[in-house]
Amino acid sequence: MTSEPSTSSEAGSSSLLDADKTNLLQEALVRAGVIRSQRQGISPTATNIKSPKKSALFEKIASHPLMPIVELLLEKCETAATTFDRKAFETDDIKRLFQSLEQRGVQLSSNRDEVDELMETAILALRTCMVELERVYSLMESFKAKYLATLRRTVCHEALVGNNGDSDDELSDNPLMPVLEMSEAAFQAQNKAMESALATLQSVSGSLSLPLQFTHQSITAAQIERNLEFLKQCGFPTQLPPNFLKPSNEKSPEKSEEEKSQKPSSSPKSPSLSD
């Protein structure tokens, strides 16, 4: 029964110690900024130092050998979180700082205290933040690449097919206007492209791609005369050459299938035999 209060008190004291360490680290960073601004000739900001004991801890943390690494990691985390620049995730400057500390012979004290553990924990936490920010940056770059690829495919599809596609809801007033406004060279190029297009035929086993060749059908004079009004509405030249229909009238071409269906031939009557 007596062990439970002791464990709860130990947990509470450990949480208080962690909170105190965090506050001490924050205040030490502020103190380090004040010292750095004093060295650079900048007016320092006011800091609240409540007791000589805390002042001694501030000085100890600010003058710790690992304090420059903590400041550099904090600066890199802030730059990476605000700008997402690729250079912010490089660790060459951190390696150079470690090498410079080793060359100057800076080492931790043999008897490790809470300040040493606090600085090492801060470095590990900041390095973990850098790794997580780099993962977010990689995911963002991957999403941007996939989105741009999809956008390029969509733009190419709209440039080839059109933004209306096959929808019947958004029909223009005159669907033939884009065709009529095309130049002759562009119209011929489009015809050549259509002749070499591929038509997908649906079969039982699957889809089969076959070249679709558009065969040129001969148009009779009767069809031209019947569709002359439609050609005028579409904007085609209405003035035909004077001898355009003459050869066809002289040759008396065969009637089209449509004319045959409209005017069925009547069976000739057999001559009556005289009695």
UniProtKB/Swiss-Prot annotation:
Disruption phenotype: RNAi-mediated knockdown results in absence of phasmid socket cells. Residues 91-161 form the MEIS N-terminal domain. One of its GO terms (molecular function) is transcription coactivator binding. Its main location: nucleus. Residues 248-262 have a biased composition (Basic and acidic residues). The keyword Ribonucleoprotein does not apply. One of its GO terms (biological process) is regulation of asymmetric cell division. Residues 239-275 are annotated as: Disordered. It holds the Pfam family Meis_PKNOX_N. GO terms for cellular component: nucleus. The keyword Nucleus applies. Probable transcription coregulator. Required for asymmetric cell divisions of the T hypodermal cells, and cell fate determination, in concert with homeobox proteins nob-1 and ceh-20. Acts downstream of the Wnt signaling pathway, and of ceh-20 and nob-1. This is Transcriptional coregulator psa-3. The lineage of its organism: Eukaryota, Metazoa, Ecdysozoa, Nematoda, Chromadorea.
